């Protein structure tokens, strides 16, 4: 029996490989892995979303590059992957939030909104003539005085996190989050942790390239952090990291000297 090469299964979105894989969905995930780093942190008094917009040309107008979007007063989304795909899903999320508000007279829950977006994503993995969305969204907001954070995968899978990251810097960021995150972390601490993670993922980070928003439990209102405040946070974080690196270097030198003795 002639073996069918793996490449034969990556042309149609609806065809599984013998290993049970949908190659087009995996390619969509790869688009996310190559995208800009986005971080979400759920804190006891609010939620933080932070993104490195990774602007490489001084000719680009920074305001034209959006990676964090307000969906409703109490909910926002950060994206990584194909920008055009993200825009379509953000528009749909805003529409769903407004339909729910007009129909029921109250805000849509964060989980319900995330599920609606994932339903759309999943449908685009099951029909011919379409392709998966090459983008992941971090959907975050306040539900009944509680910070909620969800990640939507190109396959349509939905996972709730305390803190997570998407994009090219995910491995570095997740290592730091798993080490530093606490259940009682405050919004101020979450902001500093998010900036620290972005700085570790990209040492050449610039304040004007960073987009950060918060939504507090107290008023459940979307708020963008000004670039001046981001600049101060980055300077504080870089100073702290430099001191830690210097201390580690001194410890290594002491250890080396003791071994030589």
From Swiss-Prot:
Coiled-coil zones: none
Name listed for the protein in its UniProt record: Proteasome subunit alpha
PROSITE patterns in UniProt: PROTEASOME_ALPHA_1, PROTEASOME_ALPHA_2
Record keywords, A-Z: Cytoplasm, Proteasome
Region (Disordered): 242-261
Family the entry assigns: Belongs to the peptidase T1A family.
Organism: Methanocaldococcus jannaschii (strain ATCC 43067 / DSM 2661 / JAL-1 / JCM 10045 / NBRC 100440)
Record-linked CDD domains: proteasome_alpha_archeal
Gene Ontology terms: cellular component: cytoplasm; proteasome core complex, alpha-subunit complex
Subunit structure: The 20S proteasome core is composed of 14 alpha and 14 beta subunits that assemble into four stacked heptameric rings, resulting in a barrel-shaped structure. The two inner rings, each composed of seven catalytic beta subunits, are sandwiched by two outer rings, each composed of seven alpha subunits. The catalytic chamber with the active sites is on the inside of the barrel. Has a gated structure, the ends of the cylinder being occluded by the N-termini of the alpha-subunits. Is capped at one or both ends by the proteasome regulatory ATPase, PAN.
Compartments in which it is found: Cytoplasm
Notes on how activity is controlled: The formation of the proteasomal ATPase PAN-20S proteasome complex, via the docking of the C-termini of PAN into the intersubunit pockets in the alpha-rings, triggers opening of the gate for substrate entry. Interconversion between the open-gate and close-gate conformations leads to a dynamic regulation of the 20S proteasome proteolysis activity.
Keyword Ribosomal protein: no
A Pfam family recorded for this sequence: Proteasome
PANTHER family to which the protein is assigned, alphabetical: PROTEASOME SUBUNIT ALPHA/BETA (PTHR11599)
Transmembrane segments: none
GO biological process: one example: proteasomal protein catabolic process
Main location: cytoplasm
Highest taxon above the source species: Archaea
